[in-house]
């Protein structure tokens, strides 16, 4: 919407969100499958036949829940209070489970933090990990991605913006969310130290420590609580991510593509069922693709690496998202060039090495580059070396994205609609109110707008929305009266809740 409500930009951003979310959902599938394998002492979690694969059934269940909770209504901005309450509850469950586990391991299996860390000091692996934790490029890259992910991940944006019902909620989240993260971080080092101490032989993967530790202590209740906490966390994250991405894909790609088909009946009376059906099919497709991604590289990549891969993809939205709020000069072409360049480098420098590690692509490409061209090696693209290979890919992709966004925006001009939208987003409230008071000479009536909206949302919902608008504005809306520019803009925003800003326009 900020960059002129362009269909091509909306479609490309939706594709970036889809591809970037696939590793994120695959991460949750692997986490659940790994947890189940630890509980059942199964050593092979990724090469099982389809109908014997735990992750396959987890994907089916999560797809069903996402369809059930996220596609009951066509209005994308209608708040899913039940879904948000469920996510809030699972957040408390996983925090309770993690804190209980940390306390039990620290004071139940060991004699406190001092005893635990003293025993762990003799472990060479822990010494190596701690020795590497300086304030170098890798740490700054991970911290940057973590900050950007809280805003740019589709599920984060959906919960923070779309599902936000009160402005004061954002003020509360400013201090409550950091406290929540600090509570989780408190026992991270003790649990890692306990795992390295008890499983010094390396026969247990670090990803499985949280379940392996209570199992080693023969604590059935804590093992079950930890598994429930992890499963509930994965379920909540997958459902919200799938719903958010399905809305983007259906609104910006599927529905516009259907409207362009010659055989598609554009005069149909009710598009509401079509929109819901498109979203439900999209949710199933997203979970299927995430499962395929999990099968492709899940066995060869750690949970943390998969998560950071998704964070880096979502970070490509940051220049356009943050710049669009504070810099009026930023335009559509700058976003398109910047995101294309940044996403291409992400795919080449971060996704390709993961696929090479999974034996999907030739191993010699990692150091020697495709066709033996060394400066095309994904871990040192263009001969640049910024920290490790992950830091190199993150910094290069974000840096090129930001540079292209600023440079192209500076050397190209904005369209009229872009200048108007920039003022709406950047300027003060007073400027917003005066910038849209331009003349309207169309012959469209209020009744015409209602008929259009009823195709997608139904007569009852449309009537209620227009009545609410008339009550707020203090102006009666008669079906036969000519629609003002304010009513036109209200209708566009109303349709955007179903079709997205670009399609509604």
Language-model segments: which ranges?
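Membrane-embedded helix-loop-helix hairpins and adjacent transmembrane boundary segments
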Residues: 1-483
């Amino acid at each position: 919407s900020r960059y002129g409500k362009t269909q091509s930009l909306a479609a490309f951003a939706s594709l970036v969100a889809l591809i970037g979310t696939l590793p994120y959902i695959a991460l949750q599938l692997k986490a659940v499958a790994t947890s189940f394998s630890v509980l059942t002492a199964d050593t092979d979690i990724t090469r099982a036949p389809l109908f014997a694969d735990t992750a396959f059934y987890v994907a089916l269940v999560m797809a069903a829940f996402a369809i059930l909770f996220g596609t009951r209504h066509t209005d994308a901005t209608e708040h899913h209070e039940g879904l948000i309450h469920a996510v809030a509850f699972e957040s408390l469950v996983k925090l309770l489970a993690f804190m209980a586990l940390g306390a039990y391991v620290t004071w139940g299996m060991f004699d406190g933090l001092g005893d635990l860390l003293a025993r762990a000091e003799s472990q060479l692996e822990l010494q190596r990990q701690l020795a590497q934790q300086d304030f170098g490029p890798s740490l700054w890259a991970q911290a940057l991605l973590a900050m950007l992910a809280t805003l740019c991940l589709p599920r984060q944006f959906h919960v923070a913006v779309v599902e936000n019902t009160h402005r004061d909620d954002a003020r509360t989240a400013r201090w409550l969310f950091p406290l929540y993260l600090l509570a989780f971080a408190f026992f991270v080092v003790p649990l890692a130290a306990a795992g390295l101490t008890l499983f010094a032989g390396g026969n247990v993967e670090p990803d499985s420590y949280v379940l392996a530790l209570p199992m080693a202590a023969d604590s059935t209740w804590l093992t079950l609580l930890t598994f429930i906490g992890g499963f509930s966390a994965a379920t909540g994250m997958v459902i919200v991510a799938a719903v958010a991405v399905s809305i983007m894909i259906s609104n910006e790609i599927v529905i516009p593509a259907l409207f362009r088909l010659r055989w598609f009946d554009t005069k149909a009376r009710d598009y509401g069922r079509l929109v819901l059906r498109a979203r439900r099919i999209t949710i199933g497709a997203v979970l299927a693709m995430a499962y395929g991604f999990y099968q492709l590289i899940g066995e060869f990549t750690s949970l943390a690496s998969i998560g950071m891969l998704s964070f880096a993809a979502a970070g490509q939205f940051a220049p356009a998202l943050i710049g669009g709020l504070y810099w009026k000069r930023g335009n559509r072409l700058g976003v398109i060039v910047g995101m294309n360049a940044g996403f291409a480098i992400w795919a080449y420098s971060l996704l390709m090495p993961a696929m090479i590690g999974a034996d999907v692509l030739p191993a010699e490409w990692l150091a020697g580059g495709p066709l033996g061209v060394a400066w095309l090696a994904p871990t040192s693209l263009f001969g640049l070396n910024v920290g490790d290979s992950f830091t190199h890919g993150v910094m290069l992709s974000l840096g090129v994205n930001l540079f292209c966004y600023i440079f192209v925006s500076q050397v190209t001009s904005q369209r009229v609609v872009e200048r108007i939208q920039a003022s709406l987003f950047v300027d003060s409230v007073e400027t917003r109110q005066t910038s849209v008071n331009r003349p309207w000479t169309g012959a469209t009536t209020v009744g015409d707008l209602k008929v259009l909206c009823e195709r997608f949302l139904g007569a009852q919902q449309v009537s209620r929305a227009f009545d609410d608008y008339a009550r707020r504005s203090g102006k009666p809306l008669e079906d036969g009266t000519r629609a003002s520019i304010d009513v036109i803009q209200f209708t566009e925003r109303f349709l955007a809740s179903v079709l997205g800003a670009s399609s509604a326009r």
